[in-house]
Amino acid sequence: MSDINATRLPVWIGYSPCVGDDAVALLNRGEG
């Protein structure tokens, strides 16, 4: 799962920085 999220994260940031920030928060919560 982590690898998939890591691959999609840069794409989200590229399309929308705001969405990228949310994605980072979700990843942090998932890993935490």
UniProtKB/Swiss-Prot annotation:
<feature type="cross-link" description="Cyclopeptide (Val-Pro)">
    <location>
        <begin position="11"/>
        <end position="17"/>
    </location>
</feature>
<keyword id="KW-0800">Toxin</keyword>
<feature type="propeptide">
    <location>
        <begin position="18"/>
        <end position="32"/>
    </location>
</feature>
<comment type="similarity">
    <text>Belongs to the MSDIN fungal toxin family.</text>
</comment>
<dbReference type="GO" id="GO:0090729">
    <property type="term" value="F:toxin activity"/>
</dbReference>
<protein>
    <recommendedName>
        <fullName>MSDIN-like toxin proprotein 3</fullName>
    </recommendedName>
</protein>
<feature type="propeptide">
    <location>
        <begin position="1"/>
        <end position="10"/>
    </location>
</feature>
<comment type="function">
    <text>Probable toxin that belongs to the MSDIN-like toxin family responsible for a large number of food poisoning cases and deaths.</text>
</comment>
<dbReference type="InterPro" id="IPR027582">
    <property type="entry name" value="Amanitin/phalloidin"/>
</dbReference>
